[in-house]
Swiss-Prot record:
This is Insulin growth factor-like family member 4. It comes from the Eukaryota. Its main location: secreted. Keywords: Glycoprotein, Secreted, Signal. It is found in: Secreted. Residues 1-19 form the signal peptide.
């Protein structure tokens, strides 16, 4: 009987604890934890990107020199004639990433891909 009471008091004290570094466990007990595939994650520190759990501050390259945050943005390759450009677009919460309709964050780089070799006289 004494171990049950001790365990109940311990859990009550743990839930009522206001010590730093301890998150409010009552919030986690009342709400289902978000899932990424079969894994749960902490949305205050992580996100689920295409079935992979990432840290919120993780970055990736878009093109050769432009960084973006995959938790909040996605990288798109767009072509205009013979030029390709990488564009970072916002991810719209609750919607699947779409390179055509998502708002543009920034245009990263343009790369020229000529259909035929360019001679020096073409540039002058």
């Amino acid at each position: 009987m004494v171990p049950r009471i001790s365990a109940a008091i311990f859990i009550f004290e743990l839930l009522g604890s206001n010590s730093e570094g301890v998150t409010d466990l009552r919030l986690w007990l009342c709400q289902p934890a978000p899932r990424c595939g079969e894994w749960t994650y902490n949305p205050l520190e992580q996100c689920c990107d295409d079935g992979v759990i990432l840290d919120l501050n993780q970055t990736r390259l878009c093109g050769s020199s432009c960084t973006f945050w995959p938790c909040f943005q996605h990288c798109c390759l767009e072509s205009l004639g013979s030029q390709n450009q990488t564009v970072v677009r916002f991810k719209v919460p609750g919607m699947k990433p779409d390179c055509k309709s998502s708002p543009i964050t920034r245009i990263c780089a343009q790369e020229y891909h000529p259909k035929s070799p360019v001679s020096r006289s073409d540039l002058i």
